[in-house]
Amino acid sequence: MLRRDLLALARLVAVLTMACLLACRPAPPTNGAEQAAEVPADTTANDTAGGDEESHNAVTEVTPGPDVGGTPGERLQPTDLTYEGAFRLPEDFNWGARGLCFYPNGAGGNGSLLVTGFELLFDPAHPGESCYDPNWDCGAYCGEVAIPAPARAADWHDLPEATLLRPLTQFDGDLAATVHREYVHVEDLAYVPRRGSQTQDKLYGSLVVWYAEGAFGEDTFPTVWLANLDGTGAHGMFHIGPHETPFHGRKMGAYLFTVPTWYADQYLGGRTLVTGRCRGTPADGTEPVTTRGGSQGPTLFVFRACDTDDPTGDLDALPMLYYRVSFPGCAGPNVGDPANCDYPDFTMCDEWTGGAFVEGTGRRAILLLGHKGLGNNCYDEPPVNCHDPCSDDHGYHCQPYERQVIFYDVDALGQTALGQHNPWTVLPYTIWRPTEFYLGPTTCWNAGGMAFDRENRRLFMVERGLDDDTNAAVVHVWSL
């Protein structure tokens, strides 16, 4: 049932996407319209053999654009990370693990990982099926695992398996289904110690509506909720920021993480929670270049954690990063030109699923983990055939694809939050393609969540897609 259900969902989204594209033809340029930013070219790549201990493999240093601040001498680099090995997640997390966070109090104070379960909202009485029946009790689930000593093995089956400390538990109180029952992906989660008058620590969850254009048209929607660590006391759904540009549900929810207090105080007015998403569609297609709707590149929006057990209203937020949408100029079906994109070589297939603020040894960066299209924005609809070896479904194809980790200067992003320059002018300074992944950097399967253990300076990344249709997950570990 699982594979058939997901294929049906993929076919449905392709049909709906085509309908949206036909209805959203941009109007001709008008006087005073913003022009897309010039895209800097990449410089040389430093490729080394996969699996090396320092993990400085397949790195591209991005040529800086206009000076937008930042602190080059304090930028984290892939050479600062040492690969420690990996471990398997229990099969409970097959077709899941899109979200990951480190829980410092778990496993008797040794720290554990909280991991999202099946990627769709579902009813345990109907495992592996999307929530198409209105009578089903569907929700978002997560579990807790101990962190075993990571190991290296040629076959991922030989890796140690994490022990399940807490079984998959619903933690959204049926709230996510109020956004949409079928078009939702359960994306990420973040642990936040109790604040203000709260009586318990909190677990924040986030979602994306994977075809928001079909579900909401040009309207925005909420993407975040919170609950107690045991899943009770859920409140939401919350909209990130006010219902005005540049805030929009299409820019939120794919990843969720916290930043250090010192950084929040210096740049973000004390706000510590960050979310974002890459969804390259405009709100309505009436402008040649716009900040309304999605973003043609990853986004970062920081918001304030709640201080009460029963919060209401929109969450107080600031933009740190987003890119303008030039449609169809940048990534229109079969006609888009990357020269019109703010983000270098953006494609409509780009998906970023994990994020973390990583720091140590006097260096720091915000890292995003994702699956990047490297080809043209081909839209497979007769008579066009994109000949994508990863999928023969209708819709966008941007093969080949690769997993990337992109590094952003935290000071440049902080200066954006202070209003010192436009969010779309900040680019990643390094692109890293870890070769430790079992499927390699170039694969049809996307990545999963990312988390950072600040005390022990460990970075965790989820690799999905093992055993093909089983979509098993492995967690890779680096130290700093």
Language-model segments: residues:
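Ser/Thr-rich, Pro/Gly/Ala-heavy low-complexity intrinsically disordered linkers and tails
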Residues: 21-68
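Beta-propeller domains
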Residues: 69-93, 105-175, 229-240, 398-399, ...
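Structural signature of eukaryotic scaffold interfaces centered on beta-propeller domains
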Residues: 94-109, 172-204, 208-212, 243-274, ...
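Short glycine/acidic-enriched loop and turn motifs that connect beta-strands
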Residues: 119-124, 210-213, 280-281, 373-376, ...
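Beta-propeller blade signature
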Residues: 128-153, 215-239, 288-310, 384-413, ...
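Acidic, serine/threonine- and glycine-rich low-complexity intrinsically disordered segments
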Residues: 214-372, 377-378
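Loop/turn-rich, solvent-exposed surfaces of beta-rich toroidal or solenoidal domains
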Residues: 341-441
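Blade-level signature of beta-propeller repeat domains, shared across WD40, Kelch, NHL, RCC1
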Residues: 447-480
